[in-house]
């Protein structure tokens, strides 16, 4: 296999910022991360338990923990070469986030001092680092093999140049005489005869990484989201008018250190058409013998995903239960689940389509009849002899259809991660999959559309997606 990357922070500052921000965000939340390279992009994956230190090299990611998935398009790099014999040309490894981030910080200092150098990243074999693997993990106990094959240890070799400007110790000062052009008076100007020279310093680092076997890589699957029972909120930007207030709303629950779970609830009232007036978002604490509701009263945009917008390809509609449980009496598994990263690329188009559908519903004229869950049809009676029980059923049904509620119970510590992500990015979307999971989606821009080589097709944006499985059922 072969891996070689080149990035230049001075020539492409927006692309470098995307890469640097992603690594910095993951390092601020996790100690280790999985780097998965393929022909299309780099994916950075991390959970609180993404470690291969166990002797059995078991599964890396667990479904009951918050999973952080970040994608970086391949055209962020000036050179992106990945050669592998695996499916989709994949190379997967685990690395320490702080070690990788420290190299980027050093590169930042070099750029700030005026040097414009390429950062080259190569995967290097390190046989001397693997000499003790067989000794430490091999052997038998009572004739039984107690260990499995260890993961090979390699290095990400990172190099870049720094140009240091130096000058000679015996610089002479020459006094040159002349005449000022404005007033014709003689003037004297002192100029330095500097004996300047440049010194090139080559910085080289080796970041240890642990290559994953094919079976381990296969077990790392992006969580699926049920797009039938999903509500998506476009949150106010942190630098906007309501950003500071919404950040305080998210962090309000952090005041209570003894709270373990929060109840996240989103309500959309269909009868209102004004922006922000038809959406409610609540954080409910209902434990320790007390009940608390924290409501956001500011503007909020929402998009409800419907079944009509789903693909008809069954191979893409596979369901993975994020918490690994299917309780009795729960809704049947619906073939309408996809990773958030694959479906968010056209969110603006879906929002426009939803608004058009909503306007069409307002203008549609239908028969005045309502059917309940048992199949009974209630038709408006103009004779005035409608029974009261029919009216009550109609009112109850109308109230249910006038609003849509999505709620989920998650861990409070996972919600604290969301507050950190919200403060770091401008464009954030919160998605609530009813009684299943919660997703915090952050988009990373790559400059304006004019900066793209293809003006008609904008460049792929970077994504940071935090998947949160429910901590318990409603």
Swiss-Prot record:
<dbReference type="GO" id="GO:0030896">
    <property type="term" value="C:checkpoint clamp complex"/>
</dbReference>
<dbReference type="GO" id="GO:0000722">
    <property type="term" value="P:telomere maintenance via recombination"/>
</dbReference>
<dbReference type="InterPro" id="IPR007150">
    <property type="entry name" value="Hus1/Mec3"/>
</dbReference>
<dbReference type="GO" id="GO:0005634">
    <property type="term" value="C:nucleus"/>
</dbReference>
<keyword id="KW-0131">Cell cycle</keyword>
<keyword id="KW-0539">Nucleus</keyword>
<keyword id="KW-0238">DNA-binding</keyword>
<dbReference type="GO" id="GO:0003677">
    <property type="term" value="F:DNA binding"/>
</dbReference>
<protein>
    <recommendedName>
        <fullName>DNA damage checkpoint control protein MEC3</fullName>
    </recommendedName>
</protein>
<dbReference type="GO" id="GO:0006289">
    <property type="term" value="P:nucleotide-excision repair"/>
</dbReference>
<comment type="function">
    <text>Component of the checkpoint clamp complex involved in the surveillance mechanism that allows the DNA repair pathways to act to restore the integrity of the DNA prior to DNA synthesis or separation of the replicated chromosomes. Associates with sites of DNA damage and modulates the MEC1 signaling pathway and the activation of RAD53 in response to DNA damage at phase G1. The complex also physically regulates DNA polymerase zeta-dependent mutagenesis by controlling the access of polymerase zeta to damaged DNA.</text>
</comment>
<dbReference type="GO" id="GO:0000723">
    <property type="term" value="P:telomere maintenance"/>
</dbReference>
<dbReference type="GO" id="GO:0033314">
    <property type="term" value="P:mitotic DNA replication checkpoint signaling"/>
</dbReference>
<comment type="subunit">
    <text>Component of the checkpoint clamp complex composed of DDC1, MEC3 and RAD17. The interaction with MEC3 is performed in a RAD17-dependent manner. The checkpoint clamp complex loads onto DNA. Interacts with the DNA polymerase zeta subunit REV7. Also forms a heterotrimer with 2 RAD17 subunits. Interacts with SET1.</text>
</comment>
<feature type="modified residue" description="Phosphoserine">
    <location>
        <position position="452"/>
    </location>
</feature>
<dbReference type="GO" id="GO:0000781">
    <property type="term" value="C:chromosome, telomeric region"/>
</dbReference>
<dbReference type="GO" id="GO:0031573">
    <property type="term" value="P:mitotic intra-S DNA damage checkpoint signaling"/>
</dbReference>
<keyword id="KW-0597">Phosphoprotein</keyword>
<dbReference type="GO" id="GO:0000077">
    <property type="term" value="P:DNA damage checkpoint signaling"/>
</dbReference>
<dbReference type="GO" id="GO:0031509">
    <property type="term" value="P:subtelomeric heterochromatin formation"/>
</dbReference>
<dbReference type="GO" id="GO:0035861">
    <property type="term" value="C:site of double-strand break"/>
</dbReference>
<comment type="similarity">
    <text>Belongs to the MEC3 family.</text>
</comment>
<keyword id="KW-0227">DNA damage</keyword>
<keyword id="KW-0234">DNA repair</keyword>
<dbReference type="GO" id="GO:0044778">
    <property type="term" value="P:meiotic DNA integrity checkpoint signaling"/>
</dbReference>
<dbReference type="GO" id="GO:0000724">
    <property type="term" value="P:double-strand break repair via homologous recombination"/>
</dbReference>
<dbReference type="Pfam" id="PF04005">
    <property type="entry name" value="Hus1"/>
</dbReference>
């Amino acid at each position: 296999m072969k891996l070689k990357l080149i990035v230049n922070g001075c020539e492409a500052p927006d692309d470098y910022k995307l890469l640097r921000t992603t690594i910095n965000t993951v390092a601020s939340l996790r100690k280790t991360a999985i780097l998965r390279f393929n022909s299309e992009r780099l994916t950075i994956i991390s959970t609180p338990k993404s470690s291969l230190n166990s002797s059995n090299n078991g599964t890396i990611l667990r479904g009951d923990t918050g999973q952080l998935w970040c994608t970086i398009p391949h055209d962020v790099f000036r050179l992106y070469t990945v050669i592998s014999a695996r499916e989709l040309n994949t190379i997967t490894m685990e690395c320490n986030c702080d070690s990788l981030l420290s190299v980027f910080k050093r590169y930042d200092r070099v750029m700030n001092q005026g040097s414009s150098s390429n950062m080259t990243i190569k995967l290097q074999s390190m046989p001397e680092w693997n000499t003790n693997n067989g000794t430490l993990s091999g052997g038998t106990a009572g004739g039984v093999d107690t260990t499995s094959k260890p993961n090979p240890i390699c290095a990400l070799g990172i190099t870049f140049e720094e140009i240091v400007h130096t000058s000679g110790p015996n610089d002479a000062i020459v006094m040159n005489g002349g005449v000022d052009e404005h007033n014709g008076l003689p003037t004297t100007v002192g100029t330095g005869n500097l004996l300047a020279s440049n010194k090139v310093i080559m910085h080289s680092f080796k970041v240890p990484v642990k290559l994953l076997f094919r079976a381990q890589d296969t077990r790392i699957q992006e969580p699926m989201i049920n797009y039938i029972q999903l509500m998506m909120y476009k949150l106010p930007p942190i630098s906007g008018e309501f950003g500071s207030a919404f950040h305080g709303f998210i962090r309000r629950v952090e005041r209570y250190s003894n709270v373990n779970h929060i109840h996240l609830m989103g309500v959309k009232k269909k009868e209102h058409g004004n922006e922000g007036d038809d959406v409610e978002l609540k954080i409910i604490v209902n434990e320790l013998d007390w009940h608390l509701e924290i409501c956001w009263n500011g503007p909020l945009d929402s998009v409800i995903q419907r079944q009509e917008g789903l693909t008809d390809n069954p191979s893409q509609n596979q369901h993975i239960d994020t918490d690994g449980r299917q309780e009795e009496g729960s809704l049947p598994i619906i073939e309408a689940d996809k990773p958030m990263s694959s479906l968010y690329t056209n969110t603006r188009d879906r929002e426009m389509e939803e608004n058009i559908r909503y306007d069409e519903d307002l203008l549609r004229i239908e028969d005045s009849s309502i059917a309940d869950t048992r199949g009974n049809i209630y038709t408006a009676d103009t004779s005035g002899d409608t029974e009261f029980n029919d009216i009550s059923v109609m009112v109850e049904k109308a109230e249910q259809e006038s609003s849509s509620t999505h709620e989920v119970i998650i861990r409070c510590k996972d919600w604290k991660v969301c507050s950190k992500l919200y403060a770091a990015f401008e464009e954030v979307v919160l998605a609530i999959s009813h009684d299943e999971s919660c997703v915090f989606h952050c988009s990373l821009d790559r400059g304006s559309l004019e900066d793209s080589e293809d003006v008609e097709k904008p460049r792929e944006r970077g994504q940071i997606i935090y998947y949160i499985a429910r901590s318990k059922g409603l």
